[in-house]
């Protein structure tokens, strides 16, 4: 239930998968959005129904741990990300609001895993570019912690170290950790 975050179809698909497993507990612990049953369901129900442009955008959005309209508009050249988020919520595209004002969102973890898997397969270098752009966006807004996370995920350890050394004292004073 924890991995599916209460997603009804995910719970049902997990149940189906458990039936054929020798070690059901291990299966449940290791459940991913790229598992065959879940992947097929998400692909058929969510991705296949999207126009190519929207599908491509979903793949690129999956790189972000959390996203706001301002961030998405800035780094992915989306015209009206607020409307995009509203549409994705209406279409039940596994989008989760992270705050009451509905400014920050994330994808359901299993859906995000599938999207990221597809992005790596179809556009191998895209994730690194998006992660770096997200880091730059966060640096410009004084959010070094998020920027460092994105830089490390992008494999830019040297640049992350530079950001840390540039703002390390401030982060320590605020008791902000990476």
What function would you assign to each model-found segment?
Residues 1-37, 52-56, 63, 77-78:
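Amphipathic alpha-helical "lid/sensor" segments that cap RecA-like P-loop NTPase cores
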Residues 12, 18-26, 69, 96, ...:
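Short amphipathic alpha-helical interaction/hinge segments
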Residues 33-37, 48-49, 106, 125-126, ...:
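Short helix-capping and inter-helix turn/linker motifs at the boundaries of alpha-helical repeat units
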Residues 1-19, 62-65, 73, 89-92, ...:
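Short, amphipathic alpha-helical segments that act as regulatory/interfacial helices
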Residues 21, 113, 160-162:
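Short acidic (Asp/Glu) and glycine-rich catalytic loops that position anionic groups and cofactors
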Residues 4, 40-120, 129-132:
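C-terminal boundary/linker of central alpha/beta nucleotide-binding cores
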Residues 123-178:
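Extended alpha-helical scaffolding segments used for macromolecular assembly and cargo binding
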Residues 24-28, 78-79, 119-125, 171:
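Short, polar/flexible loop-turn hinges at active-site or ligand-entry regions and domain interfaces
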């Amino acid at each position: 239930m924890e991995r599916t975050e209460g997603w009804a179809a995910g719970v049902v698909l997990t149940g189906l998968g458990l039936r054929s497993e020798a070690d059901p507990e291990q299966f449940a612990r290791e459940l991913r959005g790229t598992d065959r049953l879940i992947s097929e369901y998400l692909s058929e129900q969510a991705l296949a129904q999207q126009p190519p442009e929207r599908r491509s955008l979903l793949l690129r959005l999956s790189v972000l741990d959390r996203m706001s309209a301002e961030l998405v508009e800035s780094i992915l050249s989306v015209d009206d990300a607020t409307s995009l988020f509203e549409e994705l919520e209406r279409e039940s595209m596994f989008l989760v609001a992270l705050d009451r004002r509905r400014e920050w969102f994330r994808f359901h973890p299993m859906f995000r895993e599938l999207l990221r898997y597809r992005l790596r397969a179809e556009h191998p270098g895209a994730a690194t570019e998006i992660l770096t752009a997200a880091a730059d966006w966060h640096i410009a807004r004084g959010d070094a912690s998020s920027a460092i996370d994105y830089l490390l995920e992008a494999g830019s350890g040297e640049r992350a170290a530079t950001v840390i050394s540039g703002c390390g004292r401030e982060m320590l004073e605020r008791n902000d950790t990476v």
